[in-house]
């Protein structure tokens, strides 16, 4: 498992004093209010201000005091260390831990690896890429077991879903 969890991407500057507009990559934008620091390209940066704006976050980071300096960060990702990440309930996983998992069914048939997790209103959907591409609903009666340590997800055989 990775040591860092990506929580957002800097998409632009905000204002003239070095604030950063961030696209959140977390399911709860309010988590940004609790952050004291983030890593940008492996370097720890202290957060001195946070505002929520629609579906974006405006962050003020120590040492970034001008629009010119802020522009240097455009496109970069914000990460938190795994030990400082939010604690998940049992049966919930970070997307970073799901992407790349092998997907097999109960009979051992290999379907491919998860390339992306798509969020929908009802449930997440796993996009599997192998010999073919397959979208799998991340629901209890399809996904039987998730083992992020083994990087393996076991599902019911596709033909039994109907």
Curated annotation (Swiss-Prot):
InterPro entries: PRC_barrel-like_sf, PRC_RimM, RimM, RimM_N, RimM_N_sf, Transl_B-barrel_sf
Keyword Acyltransferase: no
Keywords: Chaperone, Cytoplasm, Ribosome biogenesis, rRNA processing
Highest taxon of the lineage: Bacteria
One GO biological process term: rRNA processing
Stretches assigned to the PRC barrel domain: 89-161
Localization terms from the record: Cytoplasm
Classification via Pfam families: PRC_RimM (PF24986), RimM (PF01782)
Gene Ontology MF terms: ribosome binding
GO terms under cellular component: cytoplasm; ribosome
Major localization listed first in the record, in broad terms: cytoplasm
Tagged with keyword Cytoplasm: yes
Domains as described in the record: The PRC barrel domain binds ribosomal protein uS19.
Self-association state and partner proteins as the record states: Binds ribosomal protein uS19.
Function of the molecule: An accessory protein needed during the final step in the assembly of 30S ribosomal subunit, possibly for assembly of the head region. Essential for efficient processing of 16S rRNA. May be needed both before and after RbfA during the maturation of 16S rRNA. It has affinity for free ribosomal 30S subunits but not for 70S ribosomes.
HAMAP family per UniProt: Ribosome_mat_RimM (MF_00014)
Record family assignment: Belongs to the RimM family.
Name of the protein in question: Ribosome maturation factor RimM
Source species of the chain: Clostridium kluyveri (strain ATCC 8527 / DSM 555 / NBRC 12016 / NCIMB 10680 / K1)
Organism ancestry: Bacteria, Bacillati, Bacillota, Clostridia, Eubacteriales
Gene name linked to the record: rimM
């Amino acid at each position: 498992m990775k040591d860092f969890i990506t929580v957002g991407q800097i998409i632009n500057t905000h204002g003239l004093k070095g604030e950063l507009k961030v696209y959140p990559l977390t399911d709860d934008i309010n988590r940004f209010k609790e952050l004291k620091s983030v890593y940008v390209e492996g370097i720890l940066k202290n957060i001195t201000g946070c505002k929520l704006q629609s579906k974006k976050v405006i962050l003020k980071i120590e040492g970034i005091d001008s629009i010119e300096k802020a522009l240097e960060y455009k496109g970069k990702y914000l990460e938190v260390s795994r030990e400082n990440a939010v604690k998940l309930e049992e049966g919930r996983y970070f997307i970073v831990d799901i992407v790349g998992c092998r997907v097999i069914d109960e009979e051992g048939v290999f379907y491919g690896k998860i390339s992306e997790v798509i969020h929908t209103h009802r449930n997440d959907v796993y996009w599997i890429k192998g010999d073919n591409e397959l979208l799998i609903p991340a629901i209890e009666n399809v996904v039987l077991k998730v083992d992020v340590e083994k990087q393996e997800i076991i599902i019911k055989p596709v033909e039994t879903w109907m």
